[in-house]
Amino acid sequence: MNLAPTKGHEQSGLRPVLVVSKYNFNKYTNMAVVCLIISNNKKFPTHYELRCVNKVKGSVLCEHVRSIDYCARNLSFVEKLKEEELDEIIDILMGIIEI
């Protein structure tokens, strides 16, 4: 997905993202909440290194959460993350927003 335009420390350009919102939210709003994925791992506490996927390599930036209108963007499904990994990422997100 193309993340432009951005400002400051925000990531931009064409890159993979991980959808962290629930299916029903996505379906009824035509929106999705996503976290960016980068190709390197800087071992930051809010980064999660992907381990169980084949096509997408890198780290999920849990601090870079965005809501996107996926109908207005040129998106394509690549692969599904294992439930255990998604649960770990959700735990990091919950820690960031202190739920």
Model-predicted regions and their roles:
Residues 1-99:
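Conserved functional hotspots at enzyme active or ligand-binding sites that engage polyanionic ligands
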